[in-house]
């Protein structure tokens, strides 16, 4: 059981690295070079992959546009992966914006604010 999980994680990490390399050739968006693939979560049977990305853009509309372009070019990414991965069937890809970095920054900001408030009360 654990062996299957390790294999899935290992393949996901390899996919993440390969997708980053393919990005420059496939996506011709002006801000594509500022994009990072943060994680790939695969189903146990390797038929489907959720690919999480982050971007330094603050503009929600541009981020949505970029993720939509990634999803539109999922077939090209799959073709690239098929040439580079040693697996029988390349999973279907779905791209999502990873909000965890922003969420973490917001939590840190709130905690800092709480600490400052408690220092002022003392």
Swiss-Prot record:
Disulphide-bonded residues: none
Annotated keywords: Cytoplasm, Ribosome biogenesis
Keyword flag Cytoplasm: yes
Molecular-function GO term, any one: ribosomal small subunit binding
Main location per the UniProt record: cytoplasm
Keyword field contains Cytoplasm: yes
Signal peptide feature range: none
Subcellular location: Cytoplasm
InterPro entries (alphabetical): KH_dom-like_a/b, RbfA, RbfA_dom_sf, Ribosome-bd_factorA_CS
One GO BP: maturation of SSU-rRNA
Oligomeric form and interacting partners: Monomer. Binds 30S ribosomal subunits, but not 50S ribosomal subunits or 70S ribosomes.
Role: One of several proteins that assist in the late maturation steps of the functional core of the 30S ribosomal subunit. Associates with free 30S ribosomal subunits (but not with 30S subunits that are part of 70S ribosomes or polysomes). Required for efficient processing of 16S rRNA. May interact with the 5'-terminal helix region of 16S rRNA.
Entry similarity comment: Belongs to the RbfA family.
Protein name in the entry: Ribosome-binding factor A
Lineage, top ranks: Bacteria, Pseudomonadati, Pseudomonadota, Gammaproteobacteria, Cardiobacteriales
Gene for this chain: rbfA
């Amino acid at each position: 059981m654990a062996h299957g999980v390790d294999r899935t994680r290992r393949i996901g990490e390899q996919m993440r690295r390969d997708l980053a390399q393919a990005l420059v050739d496939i996506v011709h968006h002006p801000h594509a070079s500022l994009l990072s693939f943060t994680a790939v979560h695969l189903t146990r049977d390797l038929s489907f992959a959720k690919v999480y990305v982050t971007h330094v853009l603050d503009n929600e509309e541009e981020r949505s546009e970029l993720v939509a372009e990634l999803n539109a070019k999922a077939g090209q990414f799959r073709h690239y992966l098929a040439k580079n991965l040693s697996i029988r069937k390349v999973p279907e890809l779905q791209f999502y914006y990873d909000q965890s970095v922003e969420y973490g920054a917001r939590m840190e900001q709130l905690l800092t604010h709480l600490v400052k408030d408690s220092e002022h009360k003392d």
